[in-house]
Amino acid sequence: MSRIDQSKLELEERLVTVNRVAKVVKGGRRFRFAALVVVGDKNGHVGFGTGKAQEVPEAIRKAVEDAKKNLIEVPMVGTTIPHEIIGRFGAGNVLLKPASEGTGVIAGGPVRAVLELAGLADILSKSLGSNTPINMIRATLQGLSELKRAEDVAKLRGKSVEDLLG
């Protein structure tokens, strides 16, 4: 898969979580902040990143930088996805279903951020298993990256879309 040039995209960023993490040392606890950010252009490109620093703004900046390096392209059919899929990562499973126009984004928490920034306006989703934000986001992106349009499948098989759909 080729890397997506983020300089040509108008990316919007959304902060999903900021966690305070502690390292216990002899003199007490040392606190740092871990940020989780999703970026997307609302036109089929989305990515996520994590950043860790001693200050919150710096952690967010690092997370945004990381997210811009991990962009994926989402195949879309109008305002939804081509077919149903279950994204899996660790113990987190996310069911993604195409929806008819006007349905809106039916998703919870971190999954909603990913789907909205990808530009999907009509989609149903259900989070199964782990509810850890990072696992949910990774499962969603894994599912979105495995989607295929009917045209792409037909081309791979050397058939027309009409032959494929019967």
Swiss-Prot record:
Superkingdom of the source species: Bacteria
InterPro entries linked to this entry: Ribosomal_Su5_D2-typ_SF (IPR020568), Ribosomal_uS5 (IPR000851), Ribosomal_uS5_bac-type (IPR005712), Ribosomal_uS5_C (IPR005324), Ribosomal_uS5_N (IPR013810), Ribosomal_uS5_N_CS (IPR018192), Ribsml_uS5_D2-typ_fold_subgr (IPR014721)
Record GO terms (molecular function): rRNA binding; structural constituent of ribosome
Keywords: Ribonucleoprotein, Ribosomal protein, RNA-binding, rRNA-binding
Span of the signal peptide: none
Disulfide-bond pairs as recorded: none
S5 DRBM domain residues: 11-74
One GO cellular component term: small ribosomal subunit
SUPFAM superfamilies: dsRNA-binding domain-like (SSF54768), Ribosomal protein S5 domain 2-like (SSF54211)
GO biological process, one term: translation
Task of the protein: With S4 and S12 plays an important role in translational accuracy.
Assembly and binders: Part of the 30S ribosomal subunit. Contacts proteins S4 and S8.
Recorded domain comment: The N-terminal domain interacts with the head of the 30S subunit; the C-terminal domain interacts with the body and contacts protein S4. The interaction surface between S4 and S5 is involved in control of translational fidelity.
PANTHER family recorded: MITOCHONDRIAL RIBOSOMAL PROTEIN S5 (PTHR48277:SF1)
Family: Belongs to the universal ribosomal protein uS5 family.
Protein name: Small ribosomal subunit protein uS5
Lineage, opening ranks: Bacteria, Bacillati, Bacillota, Bacilli, Bacillales
